[in-house]
């Protein structure tokens, strides 16, 4: 599959998003911070590294020693989850119409999902597996 340019926007339309997506995939995170930030799980799209461009009133919140979250300064829409160390940005699937037609491929903190389950045969990582992948130095959640 060839790379596709995807475009989207926040709820009020003041923040626009553009990215390149070579391998369409959607991910879900059920960690405490994502659930607090979104009132549910956080659904993100797997995009090509460094390809996310956001224009408009973007605000960020440093949610932990190694992570930050982006949101629209006007309407509050969740824009991305990011890791501070490498500057990676994982955009909210909801910014893009039909989540850019990406299929759910991976769940993080699947063992912490509160009373719901996502259907499918995608990979489901536990909290321990997720922390080992993203925060091996600290062992800290989110």
Question: For each predicted feature, which ranges?
Answer:
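A short Gly-Trp-Pro
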Residues: 1-142
